[in-house]
Regions:
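N-terminal, positively charged/glycine-rich alpha-helical extensions of SAM-dependent methyltransferases
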Residues: 1-17
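Conserved alpha-helix/loop element of class I SAM-dependent methyltransferases that forms part
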Residues: 27-47
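Class I SAM-dependent methyltransferase SAM/SAH-binding core
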Residues: 50, 57-103
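A C-terminal cap/extension of S-adenosyl-L-methionine-dependent methyltransferases
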Residues: 90, 187, 191, 196-244
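A short acidic, Gly/Pro-enriched loop at the edge of an enzyme's catalytic core
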Residues: 102-113
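A short glycine-rich, Lys/Arg-flanked "PGG" loop and its adjoining helix->strand segment in the class I
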Residues: 127-139
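Conserved class I S-adenosyl-L-methionine
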Residues: 144-167
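Acceptor-substrate binding/catalytic loop of class I
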Residues: 147, 167-184
């Protein structure tokens, strides 16, 4: 079976914003992520923000609603088409482009903020992606991210449970070899001039098997998640860095 199979995003692009679509679960994560991001930026008004790996536009529209000047890029042309149409229908002026994280089509020192969520574990070249994010950030600009740790527990939950058993996410969409340990990402960012790094656990699942079951049942009943932003980075983690 193919790993890191990103064809799923093309296949679901047309239904991206449908509340019953499986991909729509990602939209529920934005308020949770921004609980953390807002600790570091309290006013998004007029900031120039790039979403790398924007998909059909969940995070872009969330930030645009806060008054930011938003740009989105994704390697799925189908997702970009959907994102443009949905933004237009909701009167959002968002600049969407087809492209790759490893070769961002923007000038140096363009953005106040770069957001990259649910993406770093999928890119073809993580080192080049981080270098490009640094390049397009203005001095003092913020990089916000989340991704999946490379641990036995993360593979158990993300692959065995969510892909294989519950089939809540498509089989093969992740390659556990591409999951990223926090220390690896921190070293990579610092080597590329991204400092003032902070990493926190983005804990959607709890610490025990019963916590995992309860979180899943809550999601099936309500369509939503509860999150703890803490020191438990064993499955997912969230963080920030600054270009200095």
């Amino acid at each position: 079976m193919k790993k890191n199979d990103l064809g799923f995003y093309d296949s679901c692009a047309a239904h991206w914003w449908h509340p019953k679509a499986k991909i729509f679960a990602l939209n529920h994560l934005n308020p949770l992520r921004f609980q953390y991001f807002d600790r570091h930026i309290t006013n998004w008004q007029a900031l120039k923000v790039l979403d790398v790996g924007c998909g059909g536009g969940f995070s872009c529209e969330f930030v645009a609603a806060r008054g930011a000047d938003v740009f989105g890029i994704d390697q799925s042309q189908s997702c970009i088409t959907t994102a443009k149409a949905h933004a237009a229908s909701n009167n959002f002026d968002i600049d969407y482009q087809y492209g790759f994280a490893e070769s961002l089509p923007y000038l140096d020192k363009t953005f106040d903020v770069v957001v990259c969520v649910d993406v770093l574990e999928h890119v073809a070249d993580l080192k080049q992606t981080v270098a490009e994010i640094h390049r397009v950030l203005k001095p003092g600009g913020m990089f916000f991210f989340d991704t999946i740790n490379r641990t036995f527990k993360s593979q158990l939950i993300m692959i065995w449970l969510l892909e294989e058993i519950l089939q809540e996410i498509p089989r093969g969409i992740h390659d556990p070899k591409k999951f990223i340990k926090p220390d690896e990402l921190i070293d990579l960012m610092q080597c590329n001039g991204l400092n003032e790094v902070e990493v926190k656990g983005f804990n959607l699942f709890g610490n025990s098997v019963w916590d995992n079951v309860a979180a899943y049942l809550r999601y099936k009943k309500t369509g939503g998640f509860c999150v703890s932003i803490n020191d438990n980075t064993s499955v997912m983690y969230i963080g920030k860095a600054r270009k200095v």
